[in-house]
Amino acid sequence: IRDCLLSRGLGDVYKRQVGDRYVYFSLPAWKGAGVAVPVFSLRSEKSFGVGDFGDLKRMIDWAVSTKQKAVQILPINDTTMTHTWTDSYPYNSISIYAFHPMYTDLKQLGTLKDKKAMADFNKRQKELNALPAVDYEAVNKTKWEYFHLIFKQEGEKVLSSAAFHDFFESNKEWLQPYAVFSYLRDVYKTPNFREWPKYSSYDAAEIEKLCQPESADYPHIAIYFYIQFNLHLQLLAATEHARANGVVLKGDIPIGISRNSVEAWTEPHYFNLNGQAGAPPDDFSVNGQNWGLPTYNWDVMEKDGYAWWMKRFRKMAEYFDAYRIDHILGFFRIWEIPMHAVHGLLGQFVPALPMTREEIELSLIHI
């Protein structure tokens, strides 16, 4: 515990005791080596041009064989906004819950009964796997072609299963808005929901209607239910495989959300959408950094006991025994930049105790 002198303004100084005694807790001794790797880099002969959750399970086998104890991955949430390579940045997701469809192991979805179509996909798989790097657009385009065909073939059976029913009931709070958002994004050709001619303001009752089986839009929405259910099963299988073999699977939680995301659409009150987060200038970035992400409205979040974060952490804990928060310092203060700014130069830390002009001049720092 130490005494700190703080200032509210010129000549107004008060003392506060600051300590960190309550942030420590005992942990069992643990020592081990591990590897950090993006899932998209885990390409194998069984992949479809990009690493997937099936490859993640095989990565755990490799960790076991090399006596490693941890596998850490980058964010795996859906980042689809334009269906172009600009969506490939893993830290700008459209949902904090939904996984990126490209991480689906297509083999686990089943084989197409159309033998000619299946042969064509097998040929394209070899072509994509032979590339020196991931062709993001080609991979996602091809996988979505497969999704539509396999959903038409197997979707009704899967969506009527007890396992899907349990998944849906446990996840519908985020799953329905995500599925509708993704559908409307493609219908209106933009992820910026503010520009949508209809549903630009989130209405839970209207979204619920769209998700009903009798809705004309249902088939286009239900395919997202199907994909997310399979992603859940595949990642959970990798998780259980890791736990059974004594390997810690570690996830990644980006602190920010996209301005054009499901959360910004459904829960705008939790965010300061009139500012953007970034980083101040330093030796690595002389103009600072502008991430373009809204900051959090912590005062609003505090009122419900940070329920938004609690739900997010609980969901992550289903799949990961540890996760990185990038970056934890942002929970305490963040570099906030005006909306008109391009670089990070004009930002300021929030919250902060700023110095007045008079205080700066009294400190012999002249401006």
Model regions and ranges:
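Generic detector of well-ordered alpha-helical packing
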Residues: 4, 253, 327-328
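Short beta-strand elements
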Residues: 12-23
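Acidic/aromatic-lined carbohydrate-recognition and catalytic surfaces
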Residues: 27-268, 301-307, 311-315, 334
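Flexible glycine/acidic-rich beta-alpha junction loops that bind and position SAM and/or redox cofactors
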Residues: 77-84, 258-261, 281-291, 329-340
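Active-site capping/gating regions of soluble enzymes
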Residues: 289-364
